[in-house]
Amino acid sequence: MVKCTYGYDFNIDVEDLSLKADHVFEYLRPYNCIYLDSGRSCIKILCQLFAGRELLVPAFSCFSVIYGFTEGVKPVFYNVHEDLTIDFEDLEKKITAATAGIYVTNYFGHMISEEDAERLAGLKAQYGLIVVEDNTQSVFSGDLKIGDYAVASIRKWFPVPDGGVIYSKNSLATLDIRGLRRESKQIRKLYPQIMKSMLLREVIDFPAAQIAEMFAEVERELDAYSDNGEIFLMNEFTEFIYRCNSVGDMIKKRQENEKYLRACLNSPYLRPVLPKLNEGECPFNLPMYCTCRDQMRDYLVETCSIYPSVLWRTHRYDPVNGIGNIAEMGRQIMSFPIDQRYDKEDMDFLAEAINEFRL
């Protein structure tokens, strides 16, 4: 019987579903918001702002960003340094008369610096550009730094089946969402999410691999309908589950776990991707460069039921793997789970397993 798994998909425990005051809708109340089924859908809607023009996009991005633009938007990829800061020399030389905007990613809970935000503001004013912040990994790290609009796949933060948001201090009235329905197939993720809770509580004896395959099947469905251009509003039951999750408690637990695990790691194969988070920033997970990433990950999965995330395999993405050091970043970066499911004892277990690994 599986006692616990670390990382991978969230489980939903129905006994925890009680309404909270500080849910995500309250957190984002200062903004105008459109809630959709996924971050991919949000990107497709935002493409209306850049139809037929070029959008500068960071080369270190996920598959859904690199290949996700529609409406005739042409992504032009700019380099990102190993510390995930913008390569402004590369960015500026790629601005042309066809450029409509800049897409900026705040990685792993770390917001861009004030200096970089000011530099982007200068480019925005000089060329009349629209700036979009991708805050999928940093939505709970504070206010927008420079973006006219922001996008976030908030489903990655909580035990929910779906959810993405476009948010802005500007009006969103120009974005056309007429005819969108609340019929996302992502609601089917509830089945494996609840079964995983039952498995972890030892209520059922069911092959963990089959539950993992159920999660994978839902993601394949998302891939299929997203590729077909289908977009859905957030499911109503998903809204209820979001209202049962405290943002404040989530932020506090992630901050504690990230700080503790970072201090405990001493593997000779690892080095931090980012410096320590600034005051008030909320970590998505703990990213590390690993000189033997795939070997360590295989060991952790097979021996300890630890599932580190690989964000992202950019060495496999043809549009970006020839830019700067993006390919090598895709081969080495691995992210360890520090989310609100876990406590200090769990971080001790992770640290011991990671530190004990040897080639």
Please identify what each model-predicted range represents.
Residues F10-R29, K44-Q126, S138:
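PLP-dependent aminotransferase-like
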Residues T105, V132-E133:
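Hydrophobic residues in beta-strands of the RecA-like P-loop NTPase core, especially within AAA+ ATPase
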Residues G7-N11, H23-V24, P30-I34, S61, ...:
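PLP-dependent aminotransferase class I/II
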Residues G101, I130, Y149:
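Short, Asp-centered acidic motifs that coordinate Mg2+ and/or phosphate
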Residues Y67, L84-D90, P159-V165, D318-N321:
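Short, charged, surface-exposed secondary-structure boundary motifs
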Residues W157, S171-L175, D343:
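Short helix-loop capping/hinge motifs at secondary-structure junctions, enriched
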Residues P75-V76, V131, P308:
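Hydrophobic beta-strand scaffold residues
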